[in-house]
Amino acid sequence: MKASILTKLETLVERYEEVQHLLGDPDVIGNQDKFRALSKEYSQLEEVTKCFQAYQQAQDDLAAAEDMANEDDEEMREMAQEEIKEAKEAIERLTDELQILLLPKDPNDDRNCFLEIRAGAGGDEAGIFAGDLFRMYSKYAEKRGWRIEVMSSNEAEHGGYKEMIAKVSGDGAYGVLKFESGGHRVQRVPATESQGRVHTSACTVAVMAEIPEADLPEIKAADLKIDTFRASGAGGQHVNTTDSAIRITHLPTGTVVECQDERSQHKNKAKAMAVLAARIVQAEEERRAAEVSDTRRNLLGSGDRSDRIRTYNYPQGRVSDHRINLTIYRLNEVMEGDLQSLIDPVVQEHQADQLAALAENG
């Protein structure tokens, strides 16, 4: 392992011990904000510290085994060779783990997120599939112990959604779901298809980090156009008699957010503003990322949500992720919320790309 990496790890361990000491300080315990911030830092440092301590122990074990390999006793030498092999394997594995733990963290990864699903090409079937995707993500959120809440929805006439936005609340929700952004294509025989022909339709998914109040961008009232209207259900029928639904247009960027799920206009406006802020910040981050990663592929997809990332093929029972050439034949399980087998390989590929970029930059 490089000396520069070892120095960085030693610094992190020192900070871990310092934070551990501070958490026992009565002044810190009495200051809720400070205690919360230090507790979070402590939990972030704990994993890398424990891993580095295991690495150091493996190095000590290797040195001891190499000494033992020089013994006169043949049985001791054989035992030493076995211990040397085990220690070297542990060092290699822990080195890889430490490199991943030291990769730059996306500051948004720990945050809640907004999940936006829009029906694309494919008519009624696209709307039905948008509903299927929302159910899939809801099931996945349930397995993770996250809470999912519909912020805004526009139901399709034959089931599902024309478009919908949900808030996913839970530890690391954005970091896990951010790779879901992009085009999702479905190939199946629609329930209305009498000839048994397979149809292709598509939906787009966008995942945006929820922005904490302290980090919200300044949005001037003069830059907003706010319209109120009556909430409507599937087929356009009005579902209440007051103008409680809200449409907010951010004039400088042309970003539009609608919210009509609450009966209160005030609540709909608050929800719409939260989504608007997330969209504005996301667009700016995507613009910056595009500037620095023209040459390197970006598994997070581009601002163009039509980038096809995944195909769900019902006749073959398969799901394919086009970004990493992965195909699994577990469609039913995936649609029931078993997404980890699709998410983990993309995260691993992203980490491999980050490691390659670090190696290129020395």
Curated annotation (Swiss-Prot):
Q: Does the keyword Cytoplasm apply?
A: yes
Mind listing the UniProt keywords for this protein, alphabetically?
A: Cytoplasm, Methylation, Protein biosynthesis
PTM note: Methylated by PrmC. Methylation increases the termination efficiency of RF1.
Matching SMART domains: PCRF
One Pfam family name is: PCRF
Q: Does the keyword Cytoplasm apply?
A: yes
Q: Which family does it belong to?
A: Belongs to the prokaryotic/mitochondrial release factor family.
Cited HAMAP family: Rel_fac_1
Which function does this protein serve?
Peptide chain release factor 1 directs the termination of translation in response to the peptide chain termination codons UAG and UAA.
Cross-referenced NCBIfam families = prfA, PRK00591.1
Q: What is this protein called?
A: Peptide chain release factor 1
What is the organism field in this record? Vibrio campbellii (strain ATCC BAA-1116)
Please name the taxonomic classification of the source: Bacteria, Pseudomonadati, Pseudomonadota, Gammaproteobacteria, Vibrionales
What gene is it encoded by? prfA
